[in-house]
Design a protein with these regions (language model features):
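Short, well-formed alpha-helical segments that are part of the catalytic scaffolds
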Residues: 80-89, 99, 103-119
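Active-site donor/metal-binding and catalytic loop motifs
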Residues: 274-294, 299, 303
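Glycine-rich, basic loop-to-helix element that forms the pyrophosphate-binding segment
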Residues: 131-145
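A recurrent flexible, glycine/aromatic-enriched loop bordering the glycosyltransferase active site
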Residues: 210-237
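Conserved donor NDP-sugar-binding/catalytic core segment of glycosyltransferases
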Residues: 158, 162-201
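Donor nucleotide-sugar recognition loop
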Residues: 229-230, 239, 243-264, 271-282
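Short aromatic/hydrophobic "clamp" motif used to bind/position activated sugar donors
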Residues: 150
Length: 347
């Protein structure tokens, strides 16, 4: 594969350049979008909020407006315009899902989702019940797996979109390593340290009543390309990627920072890394940043001194909206439609 040559050349990623924040333009666009929403013009309003967000990516109120418009449209049964992807290439081969879990209930719930969305696929679930660390467990799982397409994921996730398998294969045809949350600028101790406009996630949070808190971070969609760091809740790539860039089980012998390490090394090696936002999962956990995490964060910085943060972590501010789980996929379809469109002039 092409990336095998790139592995011989390690490069330090640079910070991507974005247009400067234009608060004046963002405010004009935001107020126009609010007026359109009040008039019930949800499609135009959502598009306007998207433009406002691109002008000022650090303002989550525009993301909130997009979510509100998308929910109104989804509840009305109005479907977002579809992109014809029939000719897009798909990665071929068996799919191996590798999960470390000591919770039978979580594992059974995840397997139920996988059975549903992969029912027409050639796939397998590799369960590691006694992992000493995620690196050790995932490495052992990879040795057991038969698939060409490898997925490492947590056991406390669920899958929202029914065409998950097709989306996964499309993304793996275009990229070497993908996740569902991440950043195109690696700095600090976590994937979201840099903040907007670099960070992106559409991961939702489930509620006890079955609804989802739909998250929206980053004015990108439905893909953030050239990612430098990915969150480990869900990582996928071809088998050769993980064989060429193995998990560092010696340094990260616990359950933190293994994901930052692996994805950052993949980026440094020149692999095509991306955040595939439209894979649409929910995650039960909001993350654990206690003493154990800090210990491994220190190891990460010791291994890669260039990641030493020059500023405090950016606030993790995301648009969030409670929606019925059945409406999450059509809601995010509108988000993808608006964020994929180009900017237009202000009337």
């Amino acid at each position: 594969m092409a990336f095998e040559q790139d592995l011989k050349q390690v490069r330090l990623p640079s910070r991507p350049q974005y247009p400067p924040v234009n608060q004046t333009r963002a405010e004009l666009l935001f107020q126009k979008a609010v007026a359109q929403a009040r008039a019930g013009h949800w499609q135009d309003s959502g598009s306007g909020f998207a433009e406002a967000w691109r002008s000022a990516p650090d303002q989550p109120r525009s993301a909130q407006g997009m979510l509100e418009c998308a929910l109104h449209l989804a509840r009305s049964g109005i479907v977002a315009p579809a992109i014809d992807l029939r000719s897009a290439p798909r990665a071929m081969g068996r799919i191996s899902i590798i999960v470390c879990s000591i919770d039978p209930r979580r594992l059974a719930r995840l397997k139920s989702d996988l059975d549903r969305v992969l029912r027409q696929e050639d796939w397998e679930l590799i369960h590691i019940a006694d992992a000493r660390s995620l690196c050790e467990g995932y490495t052992r799982g990879l040795l057991r797996a038969d698939g060409e397409l490898i997925v490492f994921c947590h056991d406390d996730i669920g899958i929202v979109c029914e065409d998950f398998a097709d989306r996964l294969r499309r993304h793996l045809a275009a990229h070497d390593l993908i996740g569902v949350a991440g950043s195109d600028y690696a700095t600090g101790h976590s994937w979201h340290w840099a903040g907007p406009p670099h960070t992106a996630s559409w991961v939702s949070l489930p509620r006890p009543d079955g609804a989802l808190v739909c998250g929206l971070l980053g004015a990108h969609g439905p893909v953030l390309r050239d990612a430098q760091v990915l969150d480990g809740v869900f990582l996928a790539g071809r088998r050769a990627v993980f064989e060429q860039i193995p998990f560092d089980a010696d340094t990260f012998d616990g359950f933190h920072c293994y994901d930052f390490d692996l994805s950052y090394r993949a980026c440094r090696a020149g692999l095509r890394c991306a955040v595939a936002l439209d894979l649409l999962i929910w995650h039960q956990s909001g993350g654990d940043f206690g003493e154990s995490w800090r210990r491994y964060a220190d190891r990460l910085i010791a291994k890669f001194p260039e990641l030493t943060p020059r500023a405090p972590s950016a606030p993790y501010r995301t648009g969030a909206l409670v929606a019925e789980s059945a409406l999450a996929a059509p809601l995010y379809a509108w988000i993808a439609h608006w964020l994929s469109a180009g900017p237009s002039a202000i009337d």
